[in-house]
Swiss-Prot record:
Catalytic reaction(s) noted: a quinone + NADH + 5 H(+)(in) = a quinol + NAD(+) + 4 H(+)(out)
UniProt family annotation: Belongs to the complex I 49 kDa subunit family.
EC id: 7.1.1.-
Gene: nuoD
Subunit: NDH-1 is composed of 14 different subunits. Subunits NuoB, C, D, E, F, and G constitute the peripheral sector of the complex.
Keyword Oxidoreductase in annotation: no
Keyword Cell membrane annotated: yes
Protein name listed in UniProt: NADH-quinone oxidoreductase subunit D
GO terms under cellular component: plasma membrane
Amino acid sequence: MAEIKNYSLNFGPQHPAAHGVLRLVLELDGEVVQRADPHIGLLHRATEKLAEHKTFIQSLPYMDRLDYVSMMCNEHAYCLAIEKLLGIDVPLRAQYIRVMFSEITRLLNHLMWLGSHGNDCGSSTILIYTFREREDLFDMYEAVSGARMHAAYFRPGGVYRDLPDSMPQYQASKVRNAKAIEVLNQNRQGSLLDFIDDFTQRFPKCVDEYETLLTDNRIWKQRTVDIGIVTPERALNLGMTGPMLRGSGIAWDLRKKQPYDAYDRVEFDIPVGKTGDCYDRYLVRVQEMRQSNRIIKQCVDWLKANPGPVITDNHKVAPPSRESMKSNMEELIHHFKLFTEGFRVPEGEAYAAVEHPKGEFGIYLVSDGANKPYRLKIRAPGFAHLATLDEMARGHMIADAVAIIGTMDIVFGEIDR
């Protein structure tokens, strides 16, 4: 009788569940995965090399395009590394704004993850639900920076500008009558902080809706329970961070263990899993959304009560205000010099890490005293997570490999860099 051999299957890079450009070479025995070999590099854009030829401030927009669903969290790590080298202090109001927008970014990321992961596993309904809330979060980005995604809002020493007093309004159009527009603009009459405050009150009910759709859903549990189990010891040895590590039961969160900016001034809990399977990681991320909402609410209350500067008063680093730049020649020259020549950073090296929605996102910066980085190294959380795929998928079915890729929350912008 003929012996049946294992065969290879190419999964991606055009597969809808490959989350971008993942090429996975699977070695299969029937339908069971024996080996999974991820091939990366299809989205390599040489970000680290490009940063060596741009001034510190010119490299900032590249950070938005690394993990392009967690834009401001990437900027956060980059700004912290520069501030460490410069030895400058960030005003407290700017710290709170950064924390608030980092958590808004976490919601954006987790909603994107939940919608696409649910869709991969066969629940297309959840995708529509999560994108409904993302729309409001994008409006917050737009109000503060003018861009809905790649904001470049965080700056070394603080943030680009203070929070606006008004929100962008929906305009009348052929598809919506005046009454519909009025309903849409109902919670946009006040300032940005009022809009965010309104969102924080509505959002817990939205999370309840997601949980109604998935948490006790029989099919969802069949697709995620006991799939891709990682023990706490293996999770540490494999270099997992963020929800992947917390899903295995280890309460490690940089916001608590190594607080940066105003994280030591806000209250929140660290959700952890028990089993370390895909279902636990789902529960951890859903609970994280509730905690992020709690942090945002605390930031809104503090920011409403405490006006103040939003960028450092060190004028070698901070640009002049737009009002003064448009009325004084000296400020215009200052602005021009700062954005063309940049500022010089003292010789040395610094590593700054943030609790990114996907894990520990770190920037290692080496300066030789010039206005450009001598070397910039990006520590992407997804890179270590993708390397664990072989171990997690072995012995599971092909369909489970899709659920495991989904649970990792992979974005190739940061992995290929």
